[in-house]
Amino acid sequence: MPRAVFLVLLVLSLGDTKAQLTIDATLTPAQLVQNVFQGPGVTIQNVQYQYMPADSIVPELGAFSAESIPGLPYGGIVLTTGALADIIQPADSFASSEHLQGIDSDTDISWVMYGFGTSTGVPDFSILEFDFVPDEGILEFAYALASEEYPEYACGYPDGFGFFLSGPGISGAYPYTDNADNLAVLPGTLLSVNVSNINGGDPDDMANCPPNNEQYYLDNADNPWMVFDGLTTLLTVSREVTPGVQYHMRLELADAGDPYWDSALFFQVNSFRSVAASTAVNDVPDNGTSWIRCSTDHAVQLLGIKDACVLRLSDMHGREVLRRRVDPGQRSIQLPELASGIYVAMRMGKEDNACARIFIP
C-alpha cells in the first residue's frame, strides 16, 4: 500500500488567506522525517532531534508549504536555528531567536564553518538525525538554505550546515565524527555550503565582500512572505550507498559567531529516497522525448534540444566535472576521461531545466 504523505499544515500567516508560505509547528521529529521527508526506497527509524525524544514537539522543526517563492521547495520540512514562528513575516522584518536547547558547541559543524583544528564556539545550532536503510544504490534529497545573514554579513558570519553520512564503507574526506562524509558541498568542490560560500556580495561593501558562487544565490529582500533576506537555489544531494545496509544521517545547521541572525534549511517533501544505479538514462520528459544518452566513446548524445543551454555533469558526490555550452541543434558533447560510474547530467536553459542519470562505462 502506498505510504500516505502526512503534511497537515497549521497556517501561520500574515492574515492573508492566500498566504505564500505556511508552517505546521505541531508535528514530532519522527512524524516529520518518516511521513514528510521520507520518500520511496528507504526505511527510516530512530529519529532524534538534539538528544530529545522523537515524540517531542520542538520549536525549531516543522513542516511547510510554499507557493511561488523562488528557490524554495513546494513543501517539506524546515529546520531552523531560531523559532518557526519568526519565519513568516516580510523580509524587511528580522528573525532573531536564541536557541532553546542549551547546547553550546559541536566540533563537526564548527570545523565546517571555520576550518579544521579551530575551536570557535557555535552558540546556536539544530541537529536532526536518524538511521536509514536504502533499497537501491543511490541516495538523493533536495534542499535550500535561507538566512538573515544575507546580504550584509555574508562574508563575516558563515552560517552553515553539514549533512553527515556515516556507516559501512563511508570514509569522508575530513576527520568528522564516526568517519562521516559531509554531503553538503558546493558542486565540483569539497567546499561546504554556507552563507560565505554562496552569496551575492555585500551591496554596501562589494570591494571587500564580492559575490561568491552567485549562480546558486537568490535575493529575497522584497519578499512579503518569508523573513530571510536571501537563500540558495534548490540544491540536490546524491551519494552512492549499499542497498540493504543501515546508515546514519545527521542534518546539522548552525549560526556563526552569534545566536541572533537566524538561518533555516528547507528540505523538499518526499525527496529523501534511494534510486537504482542503472546503465540506462532515466527518461526525462522534453516534449515527449529523452534528451541525453551516453555513448561508448566518451561522448554523450543530445536529443531534442532546440535552444541554447548549458550542460553540467556532476559525480555522485555532487562534484562538478564538466560544464559546457550547448548550441541549438548540437547533437553531442565529447567528455573528458572520467572514471567509470554514475553521473548526474543537468541541462540548464533559459526556459527550462532537466536532469538525468547516466552511466559511463
Annotate each PLM feature.
Residues 162-164, 310-314:
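Beta-strand signatures of extracellular beta-sandwich domains
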Residues 313-321, 343:
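Short, glycine-anchored, charge-dense loop/turn motifs used at functional sites
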Residues 236-238, 331-336:
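Exposed aromatic-hydrophobic patches
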Residues 1-25, 279-281, 355:
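Bacterial Sec-dependent N-terminal signal peptides
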Residues 20-278:
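Aromatic (Trp/Tyr/Phe) and Gly/Pro-enriched flexible surface segments
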Residues 273-297, 304-305, 309:
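Residue-level detector of functionally pivotal "anchor" positions at catalytic/ligand-binding pockets or at interdomain
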